[in-house]
Each structure stands twice: as C-alpha cells, then as structure tokens.
C-alpha cells in the first residue's frame, strides 16, 4: 500500500532528476523533466568512478506540499550506477527525509535495477556523459546542475 506507493513516487522523482542531468548534455531531454512538485532543485551532484562503474550521486530538496504531501520539506538522496563496460545503468539507492533529517521512507534502499542504456535513452545519454575519456574532468557540468534544475522547474510551474 502506502510504502509501495512511496517507492514508486521516489523512483519517478529519480527518473526526473537523472533526466535533468541528461538535459545538460542533450537539450531535448529538458521537456521530459517537467513535472511540477517532483523536486524543486538539485542540491548536489557528484561522480565517483571505480573501475568500470561510475556512481552518480544526487540530492534533491523539494516542497512536497505542492505535490500533496503533508511534510514541509522533502530530501531525496539517490544514486545511479553506470556500468561503462556494458550498456547498463541502474538506480541503486534512494532515501527520503523530512526537514529534521528523519528518514520518512523507512530507510528505503533498492537493489540495483539494471536496465539497458541504448544510445538515445536517458541512461545512454548519462553513460556517454560519464564514460567518455576525460568526461569526469568536466566539473562545470556538475556545477551547473543546481541552477539548471531550478530553472527547469521554475518554467514548469
């Protein structure tokens, strides 16, 4: 019931966040990122590479009242693993919390859900962005995410 619905909601939010990341690389993804109330802004984004796996970690903060929830603040901490040795990406962990920092989704962690990242797919675009030689050095890309996400959601409202 309720917990399953929250998992679904957070997964939907995760896809939107990663769509925003992808829209930094391929502008046509911008249109997919517009779902008001899902997340107000991206608080941080980081890349960490271990061998062939790149972990993209993102934290979003939103005002869930706009989306019909009771909490005043909603923080979602999530990660996506990109396997540069194959065509797979996975959204791996998601934890949501309220303003006090208390976890509101019972410490929600997911097992990696791998799906194929084809050339034109969201995962494929992110994979190209982080797996290309030198991609990890493109720090300005990460620095721009916060302003870019805020602008996307401002336009969406």
Residue ranges and their predicted role:
Residues 1-157:
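N-terminal secretory-pathway/extracellular module detecting exported/lumenal segments
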